[in-house]
Amino acid sequence: MADPTELLHGTLDTLVLKTLAWGPRHGYAIARWLEAMGTDVLKIEEGSLYPALYRLERRGWIEAEWGLSETRRKVKLYRLTDAGRARLAVETAQWSRFADTVARILNAPTSVTS
């Protein structure tokens, strides 16, 4: 299998949008949730996450505001915008189609010829 870091590079924006679909979160919480859901496959580095957050904010798909964490520390909370929700729907449909196609190819019998 390819290096999970390489696979993550092309999907991190979509995964962040999905994480924020459940409500506002700060960067550390986003990373921990993705790692928990990705079991041993996903490792989210700050050097990847924060550029993704800034990129998504510039595109208008998320917005940020200062708030308090569960431990009452000041944190930047990210929230999905309506445009981000629409983008997530598009990305989800594209990934579902792509994953179905890859699964069909990988599960095809090896004796099939064209």
State where each predicted segment sits.
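Beta-hairpin "wing" of winged helix-turn-helix
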Residues: E57-K74, R79
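Basic, amphipathic "hinge/linker" alpha-helix immediately C-terminal to the N-terminal HTH DNA-binding motif
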Residues: R73-T92
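Basic amphipathic alpha-helical segments that dock to polyanions
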Residues: L49-L56
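Short beta-strand/turn micro-motifs at beta-sheet edges
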Residues: A2-E6, W66-G67
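Amphipathic alpha-helical dimerization/coiled-coil segments
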Residues: A86-S114
